[in-house]
Curated annotation (Swiss-Prot):
It is found in: Cytoplasm. InterPro entries: Ribosomal_uS4 (IPR022801), Ribosomal_uS4_CS (IPR018079), Ribosomal_uS4_euk/arc (IPR005710), Ribosomal_uS4_N (IPR001912), S4_RNA-bd (IPR002942), S4_RNA-bd_sf (IPR036986). Component of the small ribosomal subunit (SSU). Mature yeast ribosomes consist of a small (40S) and a large (60S) subunit. The 40S small subunit contains 1 molecule of ribosomal RNA (18S rRNA) and at least 33 different proteins. The large 60S subunit contains 3 rRNA molecules (25S, 5.8S and 5S rRNA) and at least 46 different proteins. Interacts with snoRNA U3. uS11 interacts with MPP10. Component of the ribosomal small subunit (SSU) processome composed of at least 40 protein subunits and snoRNA U3. Residues 107-181 form the S4 RNA-binding domain. The gene is rps902. Its main location: cytoplasm. PANTHER family: 30S 40S RIBOSOMAL PROTEIN, 40S RIBOSOMAL PROTEIN S9. This is Small ribosomal subunit protein uS4B. One of its GO terms (cellular component) is cytosolic small ribosomal subunit. It comes from Schizosaccharomyces pombe (strain 972 / ATCC 24843).
C-alpha cells in the first residue's frame, strides 16, 4: 500500500435513467462500431468528455482577457490537440463544447490498429492487443482503451516478439514445420 492513502474515485458515471430507448440504441451502435466490450467503456469516455466540457463551459463564462481563462483554456486545448481529439484548425474553447464521444473513441488503440489495417476487424484488433502483438514505439501495449497521441500514431506496429512482426512462429506453425521436415527426411531415406 502506498505511504499516502489515496481517495479512489469512480471512472464512469451511470446514466440517470436506466431504460431510455434512444440512449440504449445509440450506446449499442457505438459498442458495435468501436468493438467495445460493455457499456462501462462508453460511460467512462462520457465522464471524461463531460469533465472537459464542464471546465470549458466554466472558462467561457470568464472575460476573454482573464489570465485564468487564457492559461487554463490553452492548457485544455493543447492537451486535446496533442491527443488528436481536437483539430489544429479548431483551437478555440467553443469547439471543445462541440466534441462528441466518437472523437474520443477514434483515438483508442483498438480503433487505430483497425484503421491502420493491422487487423481484419475491430474485434480482431482487440484480440491482437490483448495477446501482446501490438507495440506503440518500443513499448508493447495490451490495453485496447490506450489513448494514442498524435505523434505516437505513426509508431503503431506489430511487436518484434510477435509472429506477425517476424518473431518466433506460433505453436501450430512450428508443429506443421516440424512435421514437414520429418516427412521430407522420411522420403529421402526411402529413396536410398
Amino acid at each position: 500500500m502506498p505511504s499516502a492513502p489515496r481517495k479512489q474515485s469512480k471512472t464512469y458515471k451511470v446514466p440517470r435513467r436506466p431504460f431510455e430507448s434512444a440512449r440504449l440504441d445509440a450506446e449499442l451502435k457505438l459498442a458495435g462500431e468501436y468493438g467495445l466490450r460493455n457499456k462501462h467503456e462508453i460511460w467512462r469516455v462520457a465522464l471524461t468528455l463531460s469533465k472537459i466540457r464542464r471546465a470549458a463551459r466554466e472558462l467561457l463564462t470568464l472575460d476573454e482577457k482573464d489570465p485564468k481563462r487564457l492559461f487554463e483554456g490553452n492548457a485544455i486545448i493543447r492537451r486535446l490537440v496533442r491527443l488528436g481529439i481536437l483539430d489544429e484548425s479548431r483551437m478555440k474553447l467553443d469547439y471543445v463544447l462541440a466534441l462528441r464521444i466518437e472523437d474520443f473513441l477514434e483515438r483508442r488503440l483498438q480503433t487505430q490498429v483497425f484503421k491502420l489495417g493491422l487487423a481484419k476487424s475491430i474485434h480482431h484488433a482487440r484480440v491482437l492487443i490483448f495477446q501482446r502483438h501490438i507495440r506503440v514505439g518500443k513499448q508493447i501495449v495490451n490495453v485496447p482503451s490506450f489513448v494514442v497521441r498524435l505523434d505516437a500514431q505513426k509508431h503503431i506496429d506489430f511487436a518484434l516478439s510477435s509472429p506477425y512482426g517476424g518473431g518466433r512462429p506460433g505453436r501450430c506453425k512450428r508443429k506443421r514445420l516440424r512435421s514437414q521436415q520429418e516427412g521430407g527426411e522420411g522420403e529421402e531415406a526411402e529413396e536410398e
